[in-house]
Every structure is written in C-alpha cells, then in structure tokens.
C-alpha cells in the first residue's frame, strides 16, 4: 500500500484531517452545532466555485466563503434562539452565490463539484503540505484557547458568570471551524466532513465523561475510520468515503450499545 506515492499522500493528509476533525468535533457536539458544520462544508463548495470563477486556487475561495459566513453567523446568533435562523439565512445566501458562480464560470468547474465528494486518493504532495500547515494553525488556536473553549462549550452560563468573553470565543471558534472544514473538504469532500466532525465526537460522549477523554476517543475513532477506509478502498476499488462513513457509523452504534449496557 505504502509503495505508491498517492497512498502515502492520502494517509498523511487523512491522518491530520482525522486529528483536527476529532478534536474540533468534541466542541461542535458540545455546542450543539452539528448542523452548522454540515452547512459550512456545503458553503465550502460555494467558495470553491467562486475561487475558480475568479481564477484563484479553489482553497482560497473556500477559506473566504467559510470564514466570512462563520463570522456573520457568529455575529447574528448571539442568542441561541436565533442560531438556526442565522445559519439557514447565511448558508442559503452563500449556497446561492456558489451555484451562480458555478453556472457563469467558463473555466474548469469539475474541481468545484469534486469538493462535494472529495478525492483523497488523488491528493498531491502540494495539497498535503496545505493540509499540514492549515491543520497546525487550527490546532494552535485550539491549544491556546483550550480552557476558554472548554468552559464556553460545556458550561456557557458559567463561562459568562466567570467573565469570559463568550461572544468573542464563539466567533474565534467558528473561524477555526471554518478553517478546519476548508482544509479537510478539498481532500475528503464536503459530505464526509459532516461524518468526521460529528460521529466520532458523538460516540465519545458515550464512553468518556471528561473533555480530554472525549477528544482522545474521538481522534482514535476518526483515525481508525480514515486509515481502515483508505486501505479497504485501495484493495476493493470502492469509494473511500463509503468505507469511512460505514466504519464511523459502526463505531457510533457500538459506543451507544456500550453505554446502554453499562
């Protein structure tokens, strides 16, 4: 398997994506933002369409659209009751723009549509370096804001009482989430991002009672899904996304049964 450069690239990129999605997923689940992570991944497709229309690298368009939309959502959804409406409004706007740019672009648009499904087997060494750099940036943000993020995600009222600037923390978190989604979507696809951001972390809630324990389990679960999915995709020539999604679902239901039988 590792004698081929494309598989080496796939495993390296997949490993970093699994790590950042596993860690970010714990906060996504803790903040009840699974729907937002799904919408950001689709907005990434719109950003790729815009980038291609402008003659930019698709990643630049993805970063622009996801970061701007996450900041707008953060500003509009200060109250939790407004969050879903804000997410729906902003995502509808950006998805509409993406479809428009895809329709009027005279350039190669196949890459933009590939963003929906990903092409982890076809990733280049340059894209591996992009994933590596952006993943490190996202993890550094998480590391330096670990205490505030943990407090705000799992005890929002307590964080406000303690004087933590919860609005600022939320916006920074959304920007880091946008960065993570843009990094991973170009490799594993927008549709699979939702799986890696939610299922490992959701399973971790059933087997661990601490945030650090949830992160460890979520990262391991994401790594198992990506590594095993890549191998099975290689030997069967079936879509890697199918195997990763199936494995993560199996881990989730296994954790659910474990929790019920305790």
PLM ranges: what are they?
Residues 43-53, 90-102, 122, 166-176, ...:
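Small-residue-rich segments of transmembrane alpha-helices in multi-pass membrane proteins
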Residues 1-19:
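Membrane-interfacial amphipathic/re-entrant helices at transmembrane-helix boundaries
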Residues 147-148, 257-262:
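Membrane-interface capping segments at transmembrane-helix boundaries
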Residues 26-108, 204-216, 233-235, 261:
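Short loop segments and helix-boundary regions at transmembrane helix junctions
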Residues 10-13, 58-66, 84-88, 132, ...:
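Loop-to-transmembrane alpha-helix initiation sites
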Residues 5-9, 80, 87-145:
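Transmembrane helix-bundle core of multi-pass membrane transporters
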Residues 193-242:
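Transmembrane alpha-helical segments in multi-pass inner-membrane proteins
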Residues 140-173:
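Membrane-helix/interface signature in polytopic inner-membrane proteins
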């Amino acid at each position: 398997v590792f004698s081929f450069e494309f598989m080496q690239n796939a495993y390296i990129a997949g490993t970093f994506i699994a790590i950042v999605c596993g860690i970010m997923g714990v906060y996504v689940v803790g903040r009840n933002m699974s729907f937002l992570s799904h919408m950001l991944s689709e907005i990434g497709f719109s950003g790729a369409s815009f980038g291609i229309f402008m003659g930019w690298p698709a990643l630049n368009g993805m970063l622009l659209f996801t970061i701007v939309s996450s900041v707008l959502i953060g500003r509009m959804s200060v109250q939790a009751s407004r969050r879903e409406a804000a997410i729906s409004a902003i995502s509808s706007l950006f998805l509409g723009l993406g479809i428009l740019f895809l329709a009027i672009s005279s350039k190669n648009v196949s890459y933009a549509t590939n963003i929906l499904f990903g092409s982890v087997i076809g990733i280049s060494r340059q894209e591996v370096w992009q994933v590596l750099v952006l993943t490190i940036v996202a993890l550094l943000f998480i590391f330096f804001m670990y205490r505030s993020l943990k407090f705000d995600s799992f005890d929002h009222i307590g964080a406000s009482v303690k004087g933590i600037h919860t609005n600022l923390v939320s916006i920074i978190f959304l920007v880091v989430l946008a960065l993570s989604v843009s990094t991973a979507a170009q490799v594993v696809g927008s549709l699979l991002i939702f799986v890696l951001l939610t299922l490992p972390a959701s399973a971790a809630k059933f087997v661990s009672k601490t945030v650090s324990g949830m992160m460890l389990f979520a990262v391991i679960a994401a790594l198992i899904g990506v590594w095993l999915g890549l191998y099975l995709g290689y030997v069967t020539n079936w879509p890697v996304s199918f195997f990763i999604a199936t494995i993560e679902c199996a881990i989730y239901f296994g954790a659910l049964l474990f929790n019920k039988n305790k």
